[in-house]
């Protein structure tokens, strides 16, 4: 959701996971980076989201985000490193920064040049799909295990 941080998403997680959820795409952190949310808090929030999903037998795909260098070089580097660290820790696929080829491209972005438009959303789906498809194939082929 627009302007939400990883903490906001964590607070809504239980509601988002109601029903027969089998795969979760976690694409969070851009607003954390813009607001200078401490990287350790970002990692804690993302860890809680991933742990909760995995405890319910929900497969997770993690999408890397990047922080603009407005909060200093150390922050930017730590933010960049958080995603591969979490992907390794939880053994989940890591999608490279999905906006990499869209930034500054007016054909892919809304007039604010921050959020993708419909064409940008399709491009994001194209980037994520190779990481998502194997999980969809596995997790939709058999009846789902109880998660609670």
Segments and roles (model prediction):
Residues 8-148:
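Alpha-helical cap/lid subdomain in secreted, periplasmic
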């Amino acid at each position: 959701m627009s302007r939400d941080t990883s903490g906001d998403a964590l607070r809504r997680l239980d509601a988002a996971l109601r029903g027969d959820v089998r795969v979760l795409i976690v694409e969070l952190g851009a607003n954390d980076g813009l607001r200078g949310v401490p990287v350790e808090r970002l990692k804690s929030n993302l860890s809680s989201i991933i742990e909760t999903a995995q405890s319910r037998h929900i497969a997770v795909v993690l999408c890397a985000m990047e922080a603009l260098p407005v909060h200093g070089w150390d922050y930017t580097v730590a933010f960049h490193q958080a995603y591969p660290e979490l992907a390794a820790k939880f053994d989940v696929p890591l999608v490279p920064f999905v906006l990499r080829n869209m930034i500054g491209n007016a054909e892919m972005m809304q007039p604010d040049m921050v959020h993708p438009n419909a064409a940008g959303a399709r491009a994001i789906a194209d980037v994520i799909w190779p990481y998502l498809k194997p999980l969809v194939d596995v997790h939709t082929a058999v009846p789902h295990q109880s998660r609670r």
